[in-house]
């Protein structure tokens, strides 16, 4: 049992004091050296390492005087064991601490009588002598400049750099400057926000126009005369004003109609009802599913679901990344066509009052791919503002003569609207996707990472039945790249695999009306 207690104490001391990075006993050891621990140390002292013995002996100096008096016998026995040790440093420390438990003082008269101390001091003197002797500067060095000091004392040895300060990177400095500037800007904005701004009270500062009637205010409300005192006049002379703006805002929606205008309102409601019925027939879905499709339909498929969303395709410019010319929407408002039979011989009053910049919309600097189109649509030349009169027709008197070279020849422009006018009505009635086609298109576009919006519009129009080829110079078969990804395919000999670049292509045949999807495989080495 005693041997087990000794081994436990020795292991505990080694864990506490055996660290080589700390060569001095810490003051916290005083709380660990109790009477029971000192008694166990006395029994296992001979089995401890030299470093632990030294730290233990030096740790007794941190004990309070009252504790030293209580454990005087055990401490004297430990110091006696240390004085018989083979290590010279343990032996020297034991000689120094020989008088400490009795008197509380150290024995420092060892140099002359102890040969062990003489040997240790000799070794220390040799090691200190190996170091470079310190060069003492003259007293007048603080009054001399660098050149005079070098002349007097010789070249000075540069100081040894024991460590280097870690400077902050330049990005941290820039970040701090930006934060400071943003803080100053925010404070300036707060200060400027506190300044009173008259735009909030513009209803009080603006002059009232009494020449035109105010909309939505009942006739019974008292109006102020033009000669009434201002808003800031005394309250006794003021005409009563309606109490709050919210009441006026609610009353603005009220509009007084004449009896003769009731027929027009009824006709408008009837037209709205008929339009809703037509939309419901085209989509062929219940009311709940119709609202989901209306919200989820992208703008490139607007013409295939509802005729009210045609403007979104005309207003969206074609993306320049396409490898061919995307077609304009198959469904075009009828006002974009000009049959020759309906062309007026002279400009009407509505055209005469038109601003002069509208006829100059087809400028001579249009891209060449837009010039190659047959003049069927006006929306292809001016997608932002579809005009009721096509500037490509030579019969329109408002077209300037400078635009004539950029358009097609006059006979083609006159004949094309006559031949295409009946064809225009056909896609307007028949262009609609079935439920299966809509799901197939959604599934196809879900993984497509190379197709653009005009290409999606062209694919949906072809699936719905449009047979107008926008790129006739490429033939009846047009291919559109849907997606591009890589696949690891096994080699022909069955050993290993090779990485191939896979292109998913959508092919449309305008001659037969059939479409297919297939994959093209290319080795990665051929791809730049």
UniProtKB/Swiss-Prot annotation:
PROSITE patterns: HDAG. The modification Phosphoserine is found at residues 225, 233, 363. Ubiquitous. Expressed in heart, brain, placenta, liver, skeletal muscle, kidney and pancreas. Expressed at lower level in adult lung. Expressed in fetal brain, lung, liver and kidney. It comes from the Eukaryota. It is found in: Nucleus. Residues 215-245, 320-409 are annotated as: Disordered. Keywords: Nucleus, Phosphoprotein, Repressor, Transcription, Transcription regulation. InterPro entries: HDAG_dom, NELF-A_domain, NELF-A_N. Pfam families: NELF-A_N. The HDAg-like domain is essential for transcriptional repression, and mediates the interaction with the RNA polymerase II complex. Essential component of the NELF complex, a complex that negatively regulates the elongation of transcription by RNA polymerase II. The NELF complex, which acts via an association with the DSIF complex and causes transcriptional pausing, is counteracted by the P-TEFb kinase complex. The NELF complex is composed of NELFA, NELFB, NELFCD (isoform NELF-C or isoform NELF-D) and NELFE; NELFA and NELFCD form a stable subcomplex that binds to the N-terminus of NELFB. In vitro, the NELFA:NELFCD subcomplex binds to ssDNA and ssRNA in a sequence- and structure-dependent manner. Interacts with the RNA polymerase II complex when it is not phosphorylated by P-TEFb. Belongs to the NELF-A family. This is Negative elongation factor A. The lineage of its organism: Eukaryota, Metazoa, Chordata, Craniata, Vertebrata.
């Amino acid at each position: 049992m005693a041997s087990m207690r000794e081994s436990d104490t020795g292991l505990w001391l080694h864990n506490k004091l055996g660290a080589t990075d700390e060569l001095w006993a810490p003051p916290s050891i005083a709380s660990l050296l109790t009477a029971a621990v000192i008694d166990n140390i006395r029994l296992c002292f001979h089995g401890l390492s030299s470093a632990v013995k030294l730290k233990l002996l030096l740790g007794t100096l941190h004990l309070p005087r009252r504790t030293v008096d209580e454990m005087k016998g055990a401490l004297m026995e430990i110091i006696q064991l240390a004085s018989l040790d083979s290590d010279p440093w343990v032996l020297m420390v034991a000689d120094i601490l020989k008088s400490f438990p009795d008197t509380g003082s150290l024995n420092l008269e060892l140099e002359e009588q102890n040969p062990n101390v003489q040997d240790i001091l000799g070794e220390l003197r040799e090691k200190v002598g190996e170091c470079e002797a310190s060069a003492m500067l003259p007293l007048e060095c603080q009054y001399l400049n660098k050149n005079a000091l070098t002349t007097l004392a010789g070249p000075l040895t540069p100081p040894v750099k024991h460590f280097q300060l870690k400077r902050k990177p330049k990005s941290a400095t820039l970040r701090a400057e930006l934060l400071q500037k943003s803080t100053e800007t925010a404070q300036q904005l707060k200060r400027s926000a506190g300044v009173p701004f008259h735009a909030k009270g513009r209803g009080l500062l603006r002059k009232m126009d009494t020449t035109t009637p105010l909309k939505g205010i009942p006739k019974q409300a008292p109006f102020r005369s033009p000669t009434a005192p201002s808003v800031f006049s005394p309250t006794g002379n003021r005409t009563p004003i309606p109490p709050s703006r919210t009441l006026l805002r609610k009353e603005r929606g009220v509009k007084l109609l004449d009896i003769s205008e009731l027929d027009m309102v009824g006709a408008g409601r009837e037209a709205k009802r008929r339009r809703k019925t037509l939309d419901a027939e085209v989509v062929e879905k219940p009311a709940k599913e119709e609202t989901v499709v209306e919200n989820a339909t992208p703008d490139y498929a607007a013409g295939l679901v509802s005729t009210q969303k045609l403007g979104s395709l005309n207003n969206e410019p074609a993306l320049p990344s396409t490898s061919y010319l995307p077609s304009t929407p198959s469904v075009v408002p009828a006002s974009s066509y000009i049959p020759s039979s309906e062309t007026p011989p002279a400009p009407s009053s509505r055209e005469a009052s038109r601003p002069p910049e509208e006829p100059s919309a087809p400028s001579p600097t249009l891209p060449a791919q837009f010039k190659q189109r047959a003049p069927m649509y006006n929306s292809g030349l001016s997608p932002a503002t579809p005009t009721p009169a096509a500037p490509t027709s030579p019969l329109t008197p408002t077209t300037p003569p400078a635009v004539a070279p950029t358009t097609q020849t006059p006979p083609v422009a006159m004949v094309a609207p006559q031949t295409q006018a009946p064809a225009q009505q056909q896609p307007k009635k028949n262009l609609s996707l079935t439920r299966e086609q809509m799901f197939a298109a959604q599934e196809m576009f879900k993984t497509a990472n190379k197709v653009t919006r005009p290409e999606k519009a062209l694919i949906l129009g072809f699936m719905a039945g449009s047979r107008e080829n926008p790129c006739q110079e490429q033939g009846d078969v047009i291919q559109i790249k849907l997606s591009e990804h890589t696949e690891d395919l096994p080699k022909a000999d069955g050993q290993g695999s090779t990485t191939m670049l896979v292109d998913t292509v959508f092919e449309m045949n305008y001659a037969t009306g059939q479409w297919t999807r297939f994959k093209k495989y290319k080795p990665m080495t051929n791809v730049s």
